[in-house]
């Protein structure tokens, strides 16, 4: 019997039976969201280099950034300044219009008959198997974004509960990079589901993009939490660290938001190799070595996720050498400010007239929250704009309606 000893816990754990299934999702599109697709491409390379078979990894990514007209490195993606191309060799299963909340949930649940587009691959897991999901995109209070839709906390939780009921896994780890990502699990994720979730931020704060002030003429190359957990794995190796140790390391490094964990915290005592790696004998050298030295040479410059497009445009305008280019950038910046003003005025009016005593609180009625989110998304306003430009008013509207 092979055993693993946690460096911070004296308990012994058997190597799990079954297979590891990995699902990697970049929920955004557009040039300014470069970092999400670079994050997922890096995660794919990390899993492959840690021995996870290609057939056990499913990738969902719009795939419009690597060959975007503004990309000076056509056909390549970078997750750190002057790093290696993480796009080469990437296998994408669902791209373009097939990157949807419905497909994501059907892929997770193994519902091959319900997926649309893509190659139709789903997680074909069994009761003894492990599942690792990494999601990166924008988020809001009780929701995460996809290119043309949103996924609510109720829909995600319903799928997870169903997977547990149908014995689709033995252990499940979920890493989520998004603003307010903690709201997808806080007071919702039952520890009896044997799911351990780690989020880039708590329920009420922004996550952060990083490597934003790079000299490669690119938007932010990665997200702070995402870059930190992947570099932590590369720095320490999958067989030398537990999920709990990685959580502590990443929490300390991600100093601009509060990295949180939820669910079955006992799973955190298990080695990251059970969820971020495969066959130890098939492991090859890490993609990025000498991480500590690299950080000294390339310190991270991080920006709030919602302000990345605005701040990048301002940077381009400040360095523009052509008057016409500068004027065009100035007009784009003005449009962003005007969009924000309109949306802020709308939500301020709603709060003032309907919810004068709104208070922030955890989501208690998932169905009510789900109904409010979908009503706004289909009738009132594009929630992807709300996610990017304004979130606190939406938070208050949801929480107040739910708890009134």
What feature does the model see in each segment?
Residues 1-404:
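Cysteine endopeptidase catalytic domains of the caspase/legumain-like
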């Amino acid at each position: 019997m092979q055993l693993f000893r946690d460096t911070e816990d004296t308990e012994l754990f058997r190597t799990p039976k079954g297979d590891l299934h990995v699902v990697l999702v970049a929920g955004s599109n557009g040039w300014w969201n470069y970092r999400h697709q670079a994050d997922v491409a890096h995660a794919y390379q990390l899993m492959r280099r840690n021995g996870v078979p290609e057939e056990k990894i499913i990738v969902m990514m719009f795939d419009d950034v690597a060959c975007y007209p503004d990309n000076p490195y056509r056909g390549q993606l970078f997750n750190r300044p002057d790093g290696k191309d993480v796009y080469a060799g990437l296998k994408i299963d669902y791209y373009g219009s097939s990157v949807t909340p419905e497909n994501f949930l059907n892929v997770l649940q193994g519902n091959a008959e319900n997926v649309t587009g893509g190659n139709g691959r789903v997680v074909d897991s069994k009761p003894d198997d492990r599942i690792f999901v990494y999601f990166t995109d924008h988020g809001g209070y009780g929701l995460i974004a996809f290119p043309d839709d949103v996924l609510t906390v109720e829909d995600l939780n319903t799928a997870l509960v169903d997977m547990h009921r149908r014995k689709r896994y033995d252990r499940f780890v979920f890493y989520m990079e998004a603003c307010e990502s903690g709201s997808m699990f806080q007071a919702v994720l039952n520890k009896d589901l044997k799911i351990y979730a780690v989020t880039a931020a708590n329920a009420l704060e922004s996550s952060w993009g990083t490597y934003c002030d790079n000299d490669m003429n690119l938007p932010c190359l990665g997200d702070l939490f995402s870059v930190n957990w992947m570099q932590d794995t590369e720095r320490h190796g999958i067989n030398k660290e537990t999920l709990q140790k990685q959580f502590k390391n990443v929490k300390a490094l991600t100093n601009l938001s509060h990295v949180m964990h939820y669910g079955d915290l006992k799973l955190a005592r298990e080695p990251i190799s059970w969820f971020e790696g495969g066959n130890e004998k098939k492991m090859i050298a890490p993609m990025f070595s000498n991480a500590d030295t690299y950080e000294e040479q390339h310190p991270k410059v991080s920006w709030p996720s919602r302000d990345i497009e605005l701040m990048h445009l301002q940077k381009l305008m400040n360095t523009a050498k052509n008057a016409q280019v500068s004027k065009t950038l100035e007009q784009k910046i003005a449009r962003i400010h005007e969009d924000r003003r309109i949306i802020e005025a709308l939500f301020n009016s709603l709060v003032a007239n309907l919810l004068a005593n709104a208070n922030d609180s955890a989501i208690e009625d998932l169905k009510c929250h789900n109904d409010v989110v979908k009503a706004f998304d289909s009738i009132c306003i594009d929630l992807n704009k709300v996610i990017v430009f304004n979130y606190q008013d939406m938070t208050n509207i949801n929480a107040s309606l739910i708890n009134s």
